[in-house]
Swiss-Prot record:
Residues 1-34 are annotated as: Disordered. Pfam families: GrpE. It comes from Acinetobacter baumannii (strain ATCC 17978 / DSM 105126 / CIP 53.77 / LMG 1025 / NCDC KC755 / 5377). GO terms for cellular component: cytosol. InterPro entries: GrpE (IPR000740), GrpE_coiled_coil (IPR013805), GrpE_head (IPR009012). Participates actively in the response to hyperosmotic and heat shock by preventing the aggregation of stress-denatured proteins, in association with DnaK and GrpE. It is the nucleotide exchange factor for DnaK and may function as a thermosensor. Unfolded proteins bind initially to DnaJ; upon interaction with the DnaJ-bound protein, DnaK hydrolyzes its bound ATP, resulting in the formation of a stable complex. GrpE releases ADP from DnaK; ATP binding to DnaK triggers the release of the substrate protein, thus completing the reaction cycle. This is Protein GrpE. Residues 1-26 have a biased composition (Polar residues).
Length: 184
């Protein structure tokens, strides 16, 4: 009987220990849950901040890339214009030489002269395709388009009397001024 009472006492004590352990575990789980939720919320907040930062960096990188592309395109266009301008200026010497050859040939039409005229016409057509056109010398002297190199006594004031060398523009910009004699 004493053994039975000891066993019952021990069973009661074991139950109390188990209940105490369960209670402690439950409290620990609740605390763990509280800590876990708080730490997870902190992690979420931190990750959201990192995401915002990375989005801003990405947007900035995209913006910088677009600006670089635009800058490169502008520089490329400017370089293309510069190269075209240099090339056109060099071709104008050939145009001048062909015009001098036609003037030197006189009035007699020969097959060679006809060939030179066709070559000049072809060259001028090609130049026009790329925006090179002859500067206007019919509407009076314009300091933006013409370079006065002398006075023509037969011309009226501010009128162009003689054109010594034709001028040309490239896409509206002066490529070479016309060398002219102007009236007084």
């Amino acid at each position: 009987m004493a053994n039975e009472q000891n066993e019952q006492a021990q069973d009661i004590q074991n139950e109390q220990v188990e209940q105490s352990n369960e209670q402690t575990q439950a409290e620990g789980v609740e605390q763990a849950n509280d800590v876990t939720v708080e730490s997870l919320q902190a992690q979420i907040t931190k990750l959201e901040e990192n995401l915002k930062l990375e989005k801003a960096r990405t947007a900035n990188a995209v913006y910088e890339a677009q600006k670089s592309v635009e800058r490169i395109q502008r520089e490329s266009e400017k370089h293309k214009e510069t190269v075209l301008e240099k090339f056109a200026k060099e071709l104008l010497d050939s145009v001048d030489n062909l015009e001098r050859a036609i003037q030197a040939a006189g009035d007699e039409e020969t097959p060679v002269l006809e060939g030179v005229k066709l070559t000049l016409k072809s060259l001028l057509t090609t130049l026009e395709k790329f925006g090179v056109v002859e500067a206007d010398t019919q509407n009076g002297f314009n300091a933006d388009l013409h370079q006065a190199v002398g006075i023509d006594p037969n011309a009226k004031a501010n009128e162009i009397g003689t054109v010594l060398q034709k001028g040309y523009t490239l896409n509206g910009r002066l490529l070479r001024p016309a060398m002219v004699m102007v009236g007084q």
